[in-house]
Amino acid sequence: VTSDDMSTRAQDSVRVRRGAAQDAPALIALEQSSFDSDRLSLRQLKHHVRSPSSDVWVAHDGALLGYALVFHASRHRIARLYSIAVAAHARGRGVGRALMAAAIGGARERGAREMRLEVRQSNATAIALYTQLGF
């Protein structure tokens, strides 16, 4: 992951790119279908897409498949994976792994020495991915 216009391949035709304001409605729909609580609002997502202290990564194959939101604390050189979601129909295609590669690469580009994340104990799939990635 080296530039704003990068594309990271997962499987098939899945690509990852930086999010844009026009992605916000689709991101909200994914957010609402993925989480029961602590959902981001449309206003919050639009803010994070534009904010210099966050990165939104979007996986797509012509349609939105998933996203990752990373916050950056440059003074402390720490990145925080705040949220990641993959559409139910896209799970098992490497979308989460591709989003994590973009998130980690983007954090490194910004000088982060560490990335932190939280995950529910009941989310075995995410825990397995994070463990494979060294978290």
Write out the residue ranges for each language-model feature.
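Conserved active-site alpha-helix within GNAT-family acetyltransferase domains
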Residues: R97, S122-F135
